[in-house]
Amino acid sequence: MTHRLRFAPSPTGYLHVGGARTALFNWLFVKRYGGQFLLRIEDTDKARSTDESTRAIFEGLEWLGLQWDEDVVYQGANLERHRADVAKLVSAGKAYRCFCTAQELDEQRAAASARGEAFKYDRRCDRLDPDEVTRRVAAGAPFSVRFRVPAGETAWDDLVHGRIAFPNHDIGEGDFIVLRSDATPIYNLAVVSDDIAMKITLVMRGDDHISNTPKQILIYEALGAAIPQFAHLPMIHGADGKKLSKRHGATAVGDYQHLGILPQAMLNFLALLGWSPGNDIEVMTVPQMIELFSSDGLLKKAAVFDTKKLEWMNGQHLGQMPAEQVAKIVTPLIVSAGIADEATLTSMEDRYLATLDLLKVRARTTDEIVKQIRPYLPGSVDYDPEAIAKGWKDRAGSREMIAAARDFLSRLKTWDQGGLEDCLKLLAEAKGVSAGKLYQPMRVALTGLTVSPGIFEILAAMGREQSLRRLSDAETWLTEHGT
């Protein structure tokens, strides 16, 4: 059997991280087991569907690398087939026309409530004489179409939850509507009609759709179509245990794209929201996720969207990326932020890449690299007031340490991390001071900050000329500003 799975978002907003997780699991399944991953835009709600939202869905999926295998299906273009399927149901005696008005139905619900009962449609229109139905239709009386729910039970073997069964008398309000009085299909009918046409073999979606599944299975059966497998994924909650929403912060894939999150890190993070690869594995490349993915690892328990975990995950992926690849991402950001122009970065390519190697292993996002890189680029450095207060508290002593370091380093023949470390350790011993007493004033001189990578790494990445110039500039500043 060829597996055919689909992701079917409604274009009424951004691509939510929950939707992206669903798309990812569908995509991983076909990459692992073979088949096609399809995209359907469920745009039947014309009042809320927008082209902007459709573009956001496309852009989000493309950024994540979740490419679909066939032309996009637009549900709204299938209206005639939806109506034809409803007509088949009516002709087969599986559905019937309902002439009850909204007011009449409200009265029935109120009566049921007064009796302390749940409302179930009483099938009064199903008992109409066929000639009466024909007469009303010919007279132009508005009607909806209801599916005739049979007695018994509807069950399926869910890939996540195991066997799920619904007594048919507990399905919604009884005979449910499949076509509105304006001749537009209800969600459950349109979904089944499209899934049949698209030859979908597995429906993988959020477990908030479990209650829709028995209705859909009944429609499949009534249309004489093969019933696909179902897999209902756990919901994604915020840290407070409630369904993830905007009040928890960013929930759109596009938001994280612009916050310095890497697509492969987002995929890795999303994959662990409802799936376990086993063996306590967390950090994975996309090929590793494909290799390890199994429906047996899908989880029932609601997943928690932890932004700090996402940032940690992103840092892991960022640290493993080659500097050249990091440069492709951050260079446009550095240029657009006005920190440096591309010509400058190109002219210092080796030092630029060395600096990225230095920063990427400590950064959580690409945005952090952009914010931290300025001190490592040509030009003077701005001294942070807090760094001056802490690192240069004893200004005369700091100037002495910096001057000695500049003198020692200027005579160093080989400017590499090992040589720099040996040189500065000898200097600390010669001066009879601790490493911190020497390194901290130098750190402020080189970066203007109190926190940075190791001093030897900084010197190696900056190179001889810029490092010595920074130390000389710091001497001058400390001389001018005294104690």
Placement of each model-derived feature along the sequence:
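N-terminal Rossmann-like or analogous alpha/beta NTP/dinucleotide-binding catalytic cores
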Residues: 1-115, 212-225
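Glycine/charged-rich beta-loop-alpha catalytic/anionic-binding loops adjacent to active sites
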Residues: 5-9, 197, 248
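A short glycine/serine-rich beta->alpha loop
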Residues: 9-15, 203, 426-432
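Short, solvent-exposed beta-strand edge segments and adjacent coil->beta transition regions
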Residues: 12, 70, 199-200, 251
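Hydrophobic alpha-helical segments in the ANL/AMP-binding
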Residues: 27-28, 59-61, 188-192, 442
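A generic structural motif
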Residues: 43-45, 197, 204, 317
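Conserved nucleotide- and phosphate/pyrophosphate-binding catalytic cores
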Residues: 51, 55, 65, 74, ...
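Active-site cores that bind ATP or allylic diphosphates and position pyrophosphate for catalysis
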Residues: 97, 101-232, 237-244, 252, ...
